Structure formats: structure tokens, C-alpha cells
């Protein structure tokens, strides 16, 4: 059987990996009432976290809010102001999803001092809109977010802060990875944590790790939207469902991505004379990617009044905006 664009369809095993969590979710909806938790009344989900998973954290203590704070990332205090602001912004939302209200408010005050009140609030709402599936003032696609990571990496290289991408072993941090392994199961929390650490690893010149976290963040955005539509995005019930379904769903999506990537690589390696149709499709894809990147750059330029050209070019703020330090 042949699928779209001339690719053969994935085998039944790959489809089962995706259908299993969907079937479980439908069964749960039929057998149990919905336990919807409003966004504004979110409690600390870390209190409901299974003890068996808490044992995976770096210490014997239960997972606490301090592990989600940007200052827990090695070298965070030495990062440049703009990447530092963006990482803090994403992790601020992760703390909020986890119910760490005291840490959220303290970090938000620091973000206000660095980026200004209006710009910070707009960006916070924009991130919430991405996760909840609501329309926002600027629709940023996954491709545009990937382009942002690439532009950030290039900017870091131009300032001489980083060189070539570091080897994988130099980018591994057991403590951070242990936190990630646990947090990724939490609805909402794992999404923003992945986005924040994707930016963090990009600034640390760990581009492979950054792409991995960015991909996981993109998958989580779709999963969180599904859970929100089902009304099961909060509370102990939402946590239990997420812990059961999210790993299977992510594994299925990743296998599909890898399958089509392998198919694409195989088609590229074949003689050009037999792939005229695929070349045409590839040309269209390249044009779309270029258009997306141009659109993203245009959005950055058009949003400059929020930031001022100073923060884009030299990381310096307007005199009335406050301190740059976090």
C-alpha cells in the first residue's frame, strides 16, 4: 500500500502504538466522569505525583519546585541576557503549571525588571495560547519555533560565545536529565520545561540536545491540547492519565517521525532521473520553509516596539525598563 507523496504506509505495529493510547483515552471517557480543573485554580500537582516516580529525582526528597527553577540549570547565571530571559519565561510557565505560585511570582518580578511588564505579559499569554490551542495575535508554527532556535544559535556564534556543537557526552547532565524524566509526565509542566531547556541547550551549544527537547516540546503541545479538549488537564486524575498515556503516545509519534525521515533519506539517495516528482515536492517544501523563516523574521522585526531595537541588537534595555540581571 502506498501513502502520500509516494511513501509506503507504516506497518500495523506503528499504527498500534498510536491507537493504543487513543483507545485507552476513549474507554476512560466512557467509564468515568470528567474531572476538569480550571486554569486559574490549579493546585500543586507535585503533591499528587506517584512516589515510585519521585524516586527518580536527583535526591531522596520528593520532586520540588526548586528543580524547575532556571537557576537549577548549570551555567544559567552566566548566560547572555536575551537567552536568559527566554529560558526563564518558559520555565516560569512550567512553575505555574506545577502550582509553584511563590516561585512563579518571584521569577515574574525578575522578568518584569529585565524585559518590561508589557512585553513579559504578552509573551506569557502567547505561550499559554500555544499550549491551550487558543488563537493568539501571532500564530507561530513549529517550524518557526525551530527557526528561532537556529537563529538563537547563530546569534550566539556571532558574538563568540560558542563554537561548534559539543559532543553528546559533554552535554549530558545526570541531575537535569533525571528531573526531565519525571517532569515530562506532568501535564503542561513537561511542555514548558522542554521548550525552556531547548533554548537553554541551544545557548550551551548542545544543538543535538536542543533539537531533541524542541521536538519533545512540539509533541507535548499537541498532547496537552488533546487533554484540554477532553477536560482532563488538571488534578490527580489528569496526572494519572498523563503518566499512563503520554509515554506511549510520544513513542508512537517519534517512531512515525523516524519512519518518514528514513523514507525521505532513502528517496534522496536514489538516482535523480527516477525522482522528478519527488524533486518537485522537495522544491515546494524548500519554498515553504524559506517562506516560514522569512515570516518568522518579519514577526521579530514587527514586534521590535515591544522590546526596543536595543535588546535585539545589544541586549540593552530602555533606561526606564529596569535591571538586566536575573
UniProtKB/Swiss-Prot annotation:
PTM-bearing positions, type Phosphoserine: 323
Secretion signal, residue range per the UniProt entry: 1-35
Primary location class: secreted
Tissue: Expressed by the liver and secreted in plasma.
Keyword list, A-Z: Cholesterol metabolism, Glycoprotein, HDL, LDL, Lipid metabolism, Lipid transport, Phosphoprotein, Secreted, Signal, Steroid metabolism, Sterol metabolism, Transport
Function: Minor apolipoprotein that associates with LDL. Inhibits cholesteryl ester transfer protein (CETP) activity and appears to be an important regulator of cholesterol transport. Also associates to a lesser degree with VLDL, Apo-AI and Apo-AII.
Protein's name according to its UniProt entry: Apolipoprotein F
